[in-house]
Amino acid sequence: MAGEASDLTPGRRSCPLPAIRRSARQLRWPSVPMAKRRSISLRCSKENVGPVRCAVRLREGEASFAEFDLPRKSQQAIMPLDKLGIADALSLKITEIGFENHVPSVWSAGVPFLLIPVHDVGAAQRVEFDPQLWEKIVPFVDGALASAYVYCRGGVNHVAKFHARMFASGMGIVEDPATGAAAAALSGAIRHFDRLTDGHHPIMIEQGLEMGRPSFIHLHIDVDGGAISNARIGGQAVRLASGTLDL
């Protein structure tokens, strides 16, 4: 691993979205090349949600891995939700919405998401998102249209504890393959509905399989006194292409 050091650098956007609305890979991607260029494995990035501590693991011949602390803990926004309308917007039966004691709910760790539990992986794979129906039933949270984060327990891959899909018509995104902000929001729902005991809880979330762009988000939740004391998300970053932009 590269020598330990620290760095405070303003985050750089890689897409035309507000800086707060970024996925795990959009924080991982700048962090990994910066770490390689500067030979550091620990840096702090200035984001709109606050300073974000990011640790990077660099190993020759392996995909680089980046992990960062959540600057904000996930909080629930209590509001009435139209379960039938949600099912219609996802092209699912109302009986396919929810599993165990998980029900649709709104959570945010800086970006609001309407988290929608579905019965199983098959139901998640059958989702056909209708943005027009969604915009009719989805609530506004902090002045923003909540995005849809569909999740279920288990996964296609045996290492995954949850399978997820994210749709954000309000941001011009049909579907996203790896959404760190949504995984951050999900941490609160998991602690709430699964009643996590005190201790450390590592959780693997698979996303993007339906798009042919499989991603694995590592979510770590530390619980103390029945509440989240700390949470981290991370994953691997693989260079697929590179280029330069002249301004």
Regions found by a protein language model. Name each.
Residues M1-P18, S23-L247:
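Active-site proximal loop and beta-alpha junction motif in alpha/beta enzyme cores
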